[in-house]
């Protein structure tokens, strides 16, 4: 999509901010208290447990680059890409972006990808896949907490906040106005779904990766994120998936999910 995708160069050399965290467990929930310079994003934030224990999870604050500085060339490129993408509002691409405004539970996200396979993915047809993707989403939420800073704590403003009078998708924006834009959690979700389904059904890999990419790009179209937010989300998703492959529970669920999808595809072919 011209004006939305561009290659980010020369940013991986930045040092990520170190963020101290305090972790406790209450009623089976992971409770994270993150202390950021400039004030906390949230005093407390609860995340459902996924596959990875906190000590075994990624610590992306040690390697993920910060968002572009406001006076930097990468930020100028972000803004230009966003402004160009305003021409998509009112088109079929914007309608697709509106429909992509889902992130969980798995059954809500599945239809954005399952049409590529030509099967229905839900808790009746693919219970292990649905459970697996919900757990993966929890891992994604956990891993991004240390860097997902609120605007009041120095987090990056979202495009619709920077340009409130420009056209955007007919969605509810107010709740996200004070939350940080970087990195994009939806882009993480899209890339995880595309990557995992491509591994499960490799014959559809190209279309699934394209859908996962478009799912993240939709956040630019609707004004929730800049392109570098989306790129960072995909980077974190790829790293998280690599880490998950070292977890035996994830590998076991993935193997069972492959069987579920193989059965559905075989049934469809009859």
What are the residue ranges of the model-derived segments?
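Bacterial N-terminal signal peptides that target proteins for export
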Residues: 18-28
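Bacterial N-terminal signal peptides
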Residues: 26-37
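Sec/Tat signal peptide C-region and signal peptidase I cleavage site
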Residues: 39-43
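Hydrophobic alpha-helical bundle signature of multipass membrane enzymes
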Residues: 45-221, 253
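Interfacial helix-loop-helix junctions of multi-pass membrane proteins
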Residues: 215-245
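Acidic, carboxylate-rich catalytic segments that either coordinate divalent cations
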Residues: 245-270
């Amino acid at each position: 999509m011209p004006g939305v995708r561009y290659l980010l160069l020369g940013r991986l050399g930045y040092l990520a901010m170190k963020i101290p965290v305090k972790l406790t467990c209450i009623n089976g929930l992971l409770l994270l208290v993150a202390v950021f310079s400039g004030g906390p994003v949230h005093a407390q934030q609860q995340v459902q447990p996924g596959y990875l224990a906190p000590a075994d999870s990624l610590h992306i604050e040690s390697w993920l680059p910060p968002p572009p500085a406001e006076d930097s060339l990468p930020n100028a490129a972000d803004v230009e890409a966003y402004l160009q993408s305003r021409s998509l509002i009112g088109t079929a691409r914007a309608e697709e972006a509106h429909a992509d405004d889902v992130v969980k539970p798995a059954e809500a996200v599945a239809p954005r990808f399952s049409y590529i396979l030509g099967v229905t993915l839900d808790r009746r047809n693919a219970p292990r896949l649905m459970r697996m993707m919900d757990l993966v989403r929890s891992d994604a939420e956990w891993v991004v907490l240390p860097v997902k800073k609120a605007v009041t704590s120095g987090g990056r403003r979202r495009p619709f906040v920077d340009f409130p009078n420009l056209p955007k998708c007919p969605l509810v924006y107010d709740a996200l106005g004070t939350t940080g834009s970087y990195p994009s959690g939806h882009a993480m979700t899209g890339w995880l779904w595309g990557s995992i389904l491509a591994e499960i059904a490799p014959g559809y890999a190209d279309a699934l990766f394209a859908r996962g990419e478009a799912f993240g790009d939709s956040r630019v179209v609707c004004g929730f994120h800049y392109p570098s937010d989306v790129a960072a989300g995909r980077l974190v998703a790829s790293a998280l998936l690599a880490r998950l492959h070292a977890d035996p529970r994830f590998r076991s669920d993935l193997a069972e999910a492959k069987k579920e999808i193989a059965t559905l595809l075989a049934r469809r072919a009859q």
